[in-house]
Amino acid sequence: MKQTNVNWQPENLEDDLIKLIPLIKLDFDRIFAVAADPLIWEQHPTKDRYKKEVFQLFFDSAVASGTAFLMVDKLSGKIIGSTRYYDYKPDNSSIAIGFTFLAREFWGGLYNKSSKKLLLDYAFQFVDKVYFHIGATNTRSQLGTMKIGATKVNEFEKDANGEKQLHYEYLIEKRDWRK
């Protein structure tokens, strides 16, 4: 299944709980209001992403990717986080999902699972494999990724903040995806 011309930032990803809205440059203040919580980043490789100047780099990269989303709670209309696709490889029929963060009040519930289901359902229309790359110290994200059916398939070092840090790669294949 090789498709090279895929829109990885569709405007219609939503369910009863959450809506994913394409991230644009004008969204900075609204999403930074969520990201400014230091506890969100305590397990991430970039632990100081709650600082405006550090988050600005993350945000600019997300907007430039053309594959990032705001996560919106449909009940309240509140912006609760962000996520994105990245690393699309048509020849490998794969893409990655990541760079996800959620406001703490939405941790441990249905919101992460709901957003991942929307992203996975969409991705599996075009690819056979979806990867997740998670810092080795980010046990919260590792557990959340395993809860949706991903399996750890690799360990690798990645440069983060000028130093090599251990990361884990998780995989969900289309044939194994349960809706």
Residues of each region from the PLM?
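A short, well-structured alpha-helix characteristic of acyl/acetyltransferase catalytic modules
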Residues: 1-57, 175-179
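Conserved beta-strand in the GNAT
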Residues: 70, 78-87, 96
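A short, internal acetyl-CoA/4′-phosphopantetheine-binding micro-motif in the GNAT/acyltransferase core
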Residues: 72, 98-108
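A conserved beta-turn-beta hairpin within the catalytic core of GNAT-like acetyltransferases
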Residues: 88-97, 111
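Conserved acetyl-CoA-binding loop-helix of GNAT-fold acetyltransferases
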Residues: 108-122, 143, 147
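Conserved GNAT acetyl-CoA-binding A-motif
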Residues: 125-134
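Conserved catalytic-core motifs of GNAT/GCN5-like acyltransferases
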Residues: 133, 151-167
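Conserved active-site alpha-helix within GNAT-family acetyltransferase domains
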Residues: 138-154
